[in-house]
Structures are given as structure tokens and as C-alpha cells.
């Protein structure tokens, strides 16, 4: 009897311990469940049927090079369902039909199909090939080309000799190589804001090019021979520009006016030699005007200055013969940062009758004003500049 009671007590104790253990586990599980994030609800409820959809935003890429695959990045589509709700819809390439980049196409209709409903948009396949961001081939026979945004650089001679009227350069393009449009029939080029570098001779012999608007680019240098013999009537330069290379505008017979951006410090050798430019605006901060920068510009009538002065360069100089052979020049302002006026600066000019020498000028070299028509000179500095023999040779008495 005693043994039976003992067994019953043992069983009861075991049951109590088991119950406590289960309760503890249950509590821990409840706490664990509280820590879990709530289960996400499906974006489309079961049973809701698509009635129609709209294309809210086209893909970022709508212009393709030959051989490129469809890219739906940026595409936004909204579906309307029979429960009265609108939801975003993800579109996969397998839901696209009509796309092919095997041949050029001005307008190619691409169709999205979702649950039997369809919407279309238009893409373009340019007559070019691109490999690793480099333009590798341009097909002939096209008057106008818009480059796809996969192009990062245009190599040397890419459009050399091409019979083409207009090229739209894509956003994302960084550089253009030597002689890229040399001797082509290009009439118009649209430049992107991302352009950072040009190499030499790009528009050499481009007689039909009338305007070059580089103002949105990030160029810091306009390289040598950029527009030699080009037909440009207007060139707009970017505020980021610091240097204009040698002969950049040599023999530009249609160019009439040019404003040099305020950050430009250097104007290279013979930059505007034998150009038909009539008016020029120079920044006061320019520190180097190389030899013959405006040599034999037969129509040049006015050179004026503007902007801030940067006078920290003791060698800032207008080099020899910079404005020689400009018979119509009647007004010439010397940039205020200049320290040295070179030999033959205005040699032979008879129309400039008044000249102001800025305060920063410390030296005027031999025959700087040889045989000119200057009648009045104003020196702004308290200390007259150093002069050499025959600086004023040819001045009227």
C-alpha cells in the first residue's frame, strides 16, 4: 500500500515538471514569434484580374547600338485590377516582343504583353557598334546619327571623311579622339554635358559645320587645331575652359565673334591666325597670349576685356606679334593681369589711337608699338613700366 502511494506521488511530480517545461517552451516560442517581422502581404491578392495597364515611365535606354540586348532599367508600369486597385507591375524581358538590334532602325515598336493585355513603345537602333564603351564602327549611308548612352569614348578617325549631316553625342560620353570628324560633311554636333576631353584636329576641314556649342561640356582645354579651316560662324565655349591650344581657330573664315571664358589663362600659338573674327572679349585673368595669337586677322576691329584680375604670375605676358597685321583694329584693351608686353605687339596698326597700360604691366619690350597710330597713352601704375630702346619707334611727335 505504501509502495502504491509512493508510485502515485512520483507520477504526479513528473506530470507537474512536464507541464512546467511545456509552459516554458510555449512562452519562449511566443516571445520568439514577437521578434519575427510581420509576414509581407502579396502585392497582388489571389483572384484579382488585370483589366488594363499603363506605361508610366519608359526605360532609361531607348537608343541601342547594333547587337545590344534589351534593357528595361527604369521602366515603370501600373496595372489596374478588377478589385478596383492599382499596383506596380514588374516586366521581364520574356514579356517583350518586337525587339531586334540586328539592323539599324529609326523607329522600332516594342510590345509589352501582360496577361493578354498589350502596350507598346518605340526604340531606336543606331547604325553603330559599341564594345566596352568604345565606338568601334559607324555604318555609312546615314545623314543623322544619335549615339546610344553606352558610348563612353569616340576613337581617332571615327567619322573621318563621312558624308553625314548631324550627330547627337550621348550623355555619358567622356572623350573624342584625334581627327574624329576630319574632312567630313558634318553640319551640326550636339555635345553632352559629360564631355571632358577632346584631342587635336577634331573638326579640321569641316567646311559645313556652322555652330559648335560646347558651353554645357566640362572641357578644360580646347586642343590644338580643333577648328582649322572649319566653317564655324559661332563657337560657344564652356566656363570650365582654362586653355585654348595652338591654331585652334586658324583660318576660320566665317567666325565673326568670340568670347573667351573667364577662367582661361592661356591662349596658344597662332590660335586665331588669319581668322575673320571681328570682335573678341578677353578675360582680365589671362596670363599668356602666345606669339601671333591674332596674327593677320584682317577683319578684327575690337578687342575688349572683362572679369576679375589675377595678378599672381610675374611672367604673365602678351608675346611678340600677337596683334600684328590687323589693319582694322581700332580698339584694344590690355588684360589687367598682364605684366609684360611683347615685341611688335601692335606693329603697323594705324587705327588704335588711344591705349591704356594697366597698373600690373612692368615691362614693355622692343618695338612693341612700332609704327602705330597711337596718339595718347595712359599708364595706370604709379611706377612706369621698364621700357627698351625704340619701344615707341614710329609714334607721331
Whereabouts are the PLM-identified features?
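Bacterial Sec-dependent N-terminal signal peptides
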Residues: 19-49, 117-120
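Extracellular/surface recognition and adhesion modules
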Residues: 55, 77, 110-112, 123, ...
